[in-house]
Design a protein with these regions (language model features):
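Active-site beta-loop-alpha junctions enriched in small/polar residues
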Residues: 245-247, 278-280, 301-303, 341-343, ...
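Core AdoMet radical
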Residues: 182, 186, 202-259, 265-284, ...
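Alpha-helix-loop-beta-strand connector modules within alpha/beta enzyme cores
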Residues: 254-269, 320-334, 389-411
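Catalytic cores of alpha/beta
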Residues: 283-290, 345-362
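Auxiliary Fe-S-binding modules of radical SAM enzymes
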Residues: 1-151, 354-431
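N-terminal pre-triad scaffold of radical SAM enzymes
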Residues: 168-203, 239-242
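Conserved strand-turn element in the central/C-terminal portion of the radical SAM core barrel
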Residues: 313-315, 325-352
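Short, flexible helix-coil linker/hinge segments at the edges of structured domains or between repeats
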Residues: 142-146, 150, 155-170, 199-227
Length: 431
């Protein structure tokens, strides 16, 4: 554990990052820069990266005076923390009037001490399925080649190979081609929400671009079954998951998904069938549960309607439908998770905490996946029109309080395999 705060980092605009030993780094919660408790810093995990934030000056605490001031030596710096980790504070900076909107990544605070980069976060998930060290690109490419030869006419396999694994190096797609763990099934080119931070589609007039291209076709049940059954039969801790970052809303394709699940279960009972969704169609969820859907993960930025709706901009569904979908899955004895976008200063507000407690009690939620929110913080708060985020407790304390009140709820970052759901949650997974 650190005994003093790390120093602030800045970038010279030419790809070089330096520390400024006249300033301690601060963290951001909501709109505010604050000191970060020393026990919340850990070394930047493997797979993490540092970003220059153009048009922004970092906010630090003067080592001599203890006063906050800007670091005017260069541009502010933030960290991308890798999957399985949840950040406690955002990078704190002042944005200049001509600063560009930041792309859709997470911007965690970062500091420098003892010749190492430190970030305020925790490893929330022990599953190693997306750890950077676990990938060998040659093995991925060999797996891609073999799959394309095995399924030469399967558009989904081609999409996962050429778009996801090779172009974007998507961890889920790469795992499929290595033959392990969770296998993605993108299934819907359409969506019934217009999320302002959508990672697969952005309007041309917007100041940001999506991080990947969306699926352009509707896959058939045959295409889905062809490659998922062998995966379930042979992979370790196997999961197949409808609903991915390169598509719209999978529940819009529920009939095809239903047909797929029926056929998959005719061939194998092994593994877990999961759907990642916005939870907008509880009746469709019920239909899928009837034929063997094992788990659901519902994504949301907030469990409060007035924060959720300006971000998701839902079409033809109500905020309340989300929680009904969780209740439906629980009524069938399935596994329920939320994919909870963590924004320090919003997620840990007292109002959000109280609303989350209510959701857990009313839905029987089994797991929270504490995901870092990939979005420009200023842009996001402006878009949803939040000027005051209210009283906050800190993300670390939020994690502790929820666990204290609901000791059976599980924390993580990934969908658990059936072995983990039915067996020892602390041991039965890839590690």
């Amino acid at each position: 554990m650190l005994t003093s705060s790390p120093y602030i980092l800045y970038s010279d605009g030419n790809g070089h990052i330096f520390e400024d030993t006249s300033l301690y780094v601060t963290g951001r919660t909501g709109w505010d820069a604050v000191p970060v408790p020393e026990d919340e810093w850990i070394e930047l995990p493997e797979g993490g990266q540092l970003y220059e934030l153009p048009g922004r000056r970092g906010i630090g605490i003067d080592v001599e005076t203890g006063q906050m001031r800007l670091c005017d030596k260069g541009w502010a710096v933030a960290a991308f923390i890798p999957p399985a980790h949840t950040g406690f504070y955002l990078a704190a900076y002042e944005t200049l009037s001509d600063a560009p909107t930041l792309p859709l990544f997470c911007y965690t605070a970062a500091g420098w001490q003892n010749n190492k980069t430190y970030v305020p976060c925790v490893r929330i998930e022990q599953d190693i399925r997306q750890d950077c060290a676990g990938y060998d690109q040659q093995v991925v490419e060999a797996g891609v080649k073999k799959a394309l030869e095995t399924y030469p006419h399967n558009r989904l396999v081609q999409h996962l190979a050429n778009n996801c694994a090779l172009t974007y190096q998507c961890p889920a797609a790469r795992n499929y081609f290595i033959g392990r763990w969770e296998c993605p099934i993108p299934s819907s080119p359409a969506c019934n929400a217009n999320c302002i931070g959508c990672i697969s589609f952005q309007p041309e007039e917007e100041t940001i671009i999506s991080t990947q291209d969306r699926l352009t076709f509707k896959p058939s049940a045959e295409e889905i079954i062809e490659y998922t059954v062998p995966h379930l039969e042979s992979a370790a801790f196997p999961i197949v998951s409808f609903g991915q970052g390169c598509e719209g809303e999978p529940l819009l394709m529920w009939q095809t998904i239903k047909e797929s699940i029926i056929e998959i279960r005719k061939h194998t009972q092994r593994g877990s069938i999961n759907i990642n969704t916005n939870g907008s169609m509880p009746k469709a969820v019920a239909e899928l549960c009837k034929v063997g859907l094992d788990s659901i993960r519902v994504s949301l930025n907030s469990v409060r309607k007035h924060i959720y709706e300006p971000y998701y901009c839902p079409n033809n569904y109500a905020f309340e439908d989300i929680f009904e979908s969780l209740k439906v899955m629980n009524s069938f004895g399935g596994w329920t998770s939320i994919n909870y976008f963590v924004f320090p200063g919003m997620t840990d507000s007292i109002e959000e905490y109280e609303a989350l407690r209510k959701v857990i009690r009313e839905t029987g939620l089994k797991m929270i996946q504490w995901r870092n929110f990939n979005i420009d913080p200023d842009w996001y708060l402006g878009k949803i029109n939040v000027a005051d985020t209210g009283e906050c407790m800190g993300v670390k304390q939020l994690l502790e309080l929820i666990k204290e009140e609901f000791p059976d709820i599980k924390y993580g970052y990934f969908n658990p395999p059936m072995e983990r759901i039915k067996g020892n949650f602390e041991m039965d997974f890839a590690h």
